[in-house]
């Protein structure tokens, strides 16, 4: 049997400015690339394991988890395969089939899948709709009170920053509402933990989940699950047959390269969140400059509080209507200028992020969009 050529190269994405929001927070620093080489083989972190991944001392996973708990303001923390697995584990531990959970209208599809796989009923908190798509504590209060009148709500889930509009929600405000109504709250921080400061205790939530590969400069798949101490016995309960193994995590979770790169990146990530205000400033500049071109409008809450931006772009859609390359022209014009990350054929709208770019790179992106409009309008 001959295997196909699987096209295992990312030269285009590595050698150009990548605007894809999925990629910006997962770029590995030098220390993580070294760890990737060192721990790339299979179960490489398990050479000295005595049955519990969180207790491995060589490499010092136990110490790393202590530092990770401190970083996230959690009483207990575990690595999981991704934020979605963290959400599923919490739902499975707290709920029974047929129970009800309340989620926000901007929730990631994996929140819905985690609930569906657990056999749960989903009640949605609506956003304000176009153009801001904001989810507010008041909306949570109204939906929770109305739902609690009918059924018991076992868990509320809030998306800290959503992947469609990049709205940073008022997590502390929603947590206050949930606490008063006696409903535990899980905060989905896939787009925030590792980019901006996230502290479970300060926000007043019960659980946080994060994404190492999306926002914490790690290889995927790996996520973070943090919790208050009061939930440890429930979520981290042990197997009756294999007494060392934590049942909801199916024993050991992410091993090898993903875990090693997350460990290696933590010092870098801890430092970079202190520069979050600068990232917001750059993003607001991008929005201002692109909107100044005309025919481009930012969706979501204003002013921006996160690097992920969604733009409506009728100017590019109008150009595409008469351009020989139709909807592919924007992708191709950007690629010629060394910019990637916008989907091929997409001109009505697009999402982008300049997280981690220098001011010079941001200016180059702005100038490139302006030039494309001027040359093709």
Swiss-Prot record:
The modified positions for N6-(pyridoxal phosphate)lysine read 214
The molecule here is called O-phospho-L-seryl-tRNA:Cys-tRNA synthase
Q: Which reaction does it catalyse?
A: O-phospho-L-seryl-tRNA(Cys) + hydrogen sulfide + H(+) = L-cysteinyl-tRNA(Cys) + phosphate
Instruction: List, alphabetically, the NCBIfam families matched.
Output: PRK09331.1, SepCysS
| Biological source species | Methanothermobacter thermautotrophicus (strain ATCC 29096 / DSM 1053 / JCM 10044 / NBRC 100330 / Delta H) (Methanobacterium thermoautotrophicum)
Q: Which UniProt keywords apply?
A: Protein biosynthesis, Pyridoxal phosphate, Transferase
Name the coenzymes or cofactors required: pyridoxal 5'-phosphate
Q: Where does pyridoxal 5'-phosphate bind?
A: 83-84, 188, 211-213
SUPFAM superfamilies, per the entry: PLP-dependent transferases
What Enzyme Commission number(s) apply to this enzyme? 2.5.1.73
Q: How does it assemble?
A: Homodimer. Interacts with SepRS.
Q: Which CDD domains match?
A: SepCysS
Mind listing the GO biological process terms from this record? translation
Superkingdom per UniProt:
Archaea
Give one GO term, molecular function aspect.
Sep-tRNA:Cys-tRNA synthase activity
Q: Which family would the database say this protein is a member of?
A: Belongs to the SepCysS family.
Role description: Converts O-phospho-L-seryl-tRNA(Cys) (Sep-tRNA(Cys)) to L-cysteinyl-tRNA(Cys) (Cys-tRNA(Cys)).
